[in-house]
Amino acid sequence: DLLPVIISERIINDIDMSIGNYIVIDGQFRSYNRYEDTSNKLLLRVFVRDIIVPDDNELEELKRHPNEVFLNGYLCKETKFRTTPFGREITDMLIAVNRSYNKSDYIPCIAWGRNARYCEKLEVGDHIKLWGRIQSRKYQKKNDNEDYETKTAYEVSVTKLEHIKTENNRKKEDEEGEDDFEE
């Protein structure tokens, strides 16, 4: 996957950023709204907080888990369950993740298989924690001229999910406990 990142110059001053060098990025997956033409576009970027150059021993371990993300947030839009043309069950979700200074990031997520069937039943306001990877995928969008344009979507592909039923923003508080699901 190719992912857009935002890095401060002060972070990369003493780091060899040559093509082919391995680095470890620690940061936050953030969203930004950009007004384009007549609509808002959600931009997603990895905001880099630290970069580490791993030694050879660390590198082998890190290669086993090259892209990991953890989100702790609230479902802010109704889920959309569907089956792909290849028969895969998926659920699309939008998660609001709060951060400092009363800001929130809105992160699109996709759950597969058993997780998708479980997520289909989640409600707006539900508190969830999820683990997965940030993925990029190409898709075709028809424009006003009836031509197709290739675009890139960024989303979190969910591998594990925890539904925190005792801490949610729903209007009714009738459930307790938590559920844990892993693909």
Pin down the residues of each PLM region.
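Ordered, amphipathic secondary-structure segments that act as subunit-interaction surfaces
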Residues: S18-D26, N33-D50
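Flexible glycine-rich surface loops and low-complexity tracts that mediate binding to linear polymers
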Residues: G20-R34, D126-Y139
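Acidic, gly/ser/pro-rich intrinsically disordered tails
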Residues: D1-L2, I6, R10-D16, D37-N40, ...
